[in-house]
């Protein structure tokens, strides 16, 4: 049975656990489609040199949703390294590489809102994310990404992995 799964990651230990969980649960399903998704922080174009701007602009040709946004190349490199490790974990769990994709966004919304928007636009059946390590006091005042996603997600199952 076709099953679309969005795994929201940030390179943390808890997002690695979310990837491991997804591998255990969805490896038996040859029709599962898993997408690793990360939000990079947006920065001002003024903080980049001409070569960095040129590199980022060339990457945006295929991604009109990123028009006008800029990010640090080293953040993208770190993300791509994690994506590679996560894909390897999923393959080791029994998934085929063709079942796994990766995608990123650049923060123009709050991270939770960006995850929710991607989940809705991609029509995912399941959304998996790791629990963040906020203290109870900070979580009470600020909320957390996982709390907001659980509260506001519609039309999909949400799994928060600790």
State the predicted function of each range.
Residues 1-68:
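Small/aliphatic-rich secondary-structure junction motif
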Residues 62-74, 99-100:
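Short glycine/proline- and acidic residue-enriched helix-loop micro-motifs
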Residues 75-85:
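Low-complexity, serine/threonine/proline-enriched polar segments
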Residues 84-126:
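Structural beta-alpha unit
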């Amino acid at each position: 049975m076709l099953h679309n799964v969005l795994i929201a990651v940030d390179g943390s230990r808890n997002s690695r656990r979310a990837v491991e969980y997804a591998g255990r649960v969805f490896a038996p399903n040859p029709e599962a489609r898993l997408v690793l998704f990360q939000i990079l922080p947006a920065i001002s174009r003024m903080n980049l040199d001409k070569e960095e701007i040129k590199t980022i602009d060339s990457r945006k040709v295929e991604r009109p949703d990123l028009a006008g946004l800029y990010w640090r190349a080293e953040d993208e490199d770190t993300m791509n390294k994690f994506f590679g490790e996560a894909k390897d974990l999923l393959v080791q769990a029994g998934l085929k590489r063709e079942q796994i994709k990766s995608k990123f966004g650049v923060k123009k919304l709050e991270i939770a809102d960006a995850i929710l928007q991607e989940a809705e636009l991609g029509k995912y059946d399941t959304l998996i994310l790791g629990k963040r390590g906020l203290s109870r006091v900070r979580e009470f005042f600020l909320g957390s990404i996982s709390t907001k996603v659980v509260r506001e997600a519609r039309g999909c199952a949400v799994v928060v992995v600790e």
